[in-house]
Amino acid sequence: MHVLPDLAYLEEKYPDSLTVIGVHSAKFSNEGDSDQIRKAVERYAIRHPVINDREFEIWNAYGAHAWPTFALIDPEGYLVGMTSGEGKRAVLDQAIDSLVTHHRSNGTLSLSSFPPPPSPENPSLLRFPGKIDIAGNKVLVSDSGHHRLVLLEWDEKTPEKAALADIIGRGEPGNTDGSFDEAQFRDPQGIRFFPGDPDAAIVADTGNHILRRLDFQKRTVTTIGGTGVQGWAIFEPVPALSAVLNSPWDVVFHGDGMLYVALAGSHQIIRYDPVRQEISPVAGSAREDLVDGSGNQASLAQPSGLTSDGTRIYFADSETSSVRLLHPGDTPRQSRVETLVGKGLFEFGNRDGSFHEARLQHPLGVLWDDDVLLVADTYNHRIRALDPATREVLSLTEGNVLDEPSDIKKADKAYLIANTNGHEIAFFLATPKGPVLGTVDILPGNRRDPLHAKDG
């Protein structure tokens, strides 16, 4: 995902001399499903063809060893170079420019372009919603695929319906502060209302690598952290607006009054001090792995979901298919990370049982709920319960009713789920007759959706 902007840049710079072909050699079994690949192509607006290399035939033929790997082939069909890892835009740009110049002078470059496939129609209000939060009758949704946020009015007594109350953002990718109507986001994910103040919220604007503050009274968006430039890692305290963040994916307010942020791109958890307006590291060595221990030595792998019990922070560590626990200290050295469920980067599955035996697959959301952890087990399309007292994992939903759920939040008794690939918010109720799962129907309310103005 992090290299897609680089590829888009190169495709735009060399429109008639560069053809990009994506080869998807899936790590997770869910990612090897062609339907899920099509949804990912749609979600990230990928405009080049993508091959499902499920059996790793192309991967092995090119001798790839890491994700992502780039192979550069010249107009005569020769492999002229390979490199792997993120942050390779400049290297690739220089190599492509050199090849274009050489083959144009030799007359061996055929200038042509391939029109991208048409984007599929999506008539629903939401497009790949990533995260949600609840404050009273207010529900805030990251409408990630539309690069905006949606505010709903919802009553859990009638969980099957909600009303559209407001829209935050123009619905076009960008990085602009200002009024709700003028602001622009880029693939926003984690969102939280301020504790005790439903008129303010924090947004992890993932694609812009920044943190934003929403004021629902003034209807304004303000950047409070990050520069808008993708960074590498945070190892020292830094003024919030000078911090270079790397894909902030979720946020949570903790009992110490601080905002904790999961940086999926740098495999870290950091802390935002709203009083000092400072960002500081808490846990994560910036090496992608599953290693427990002190915060400065522990290794995380794309932490993507956060929840707090007031004392500790639990997080979904997506690339290790694990749920882990953070004891935050004043410094990374004083913090501690331990793993509850999960074994490593290449250990995943779909299995209930003890913490030791259970397997998840790329979970993105967690919720602390009455001494139990609820997990959006994204690639298994399930909601699971982890009980720290019994150290057991239990599936609460079957695997054929949700489509890559990415978050779960609770009102009083009812739960809301960001059913990402279903382009919807689902509700979940535990009743004496068994669990009830349904879809929230979003009615126009006080606002109309400008992206679907003809609807309703």
Give the ranges of each region predicted by the language model:
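Conserved beta-strand positions in repeat-built beta-propeller and related beta-rich domains
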Residues: 141-147, 195, 201-207, 261-265, ...
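Beta-strand-rich domains and repeat architectures in extracellular enzymes and scaffolds
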Residues: 120-150
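Thiol-/selenol-based redox modules, centered on thioredoxin-like
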Residues: 74-131
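Short, internal strand/loop/helix patches
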Residues: 37-67, 71-73
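Residue-level detector of Asp-centered blade-edge/turn motifs that repeat once per structural unit
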Residues: 134-136, 193-198, 253-256, 308-311, ...
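Gly/Pro-rich loop segments of beta-rich domains
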Residues: 109-130, 156-189, 220-249, 278-302, ...
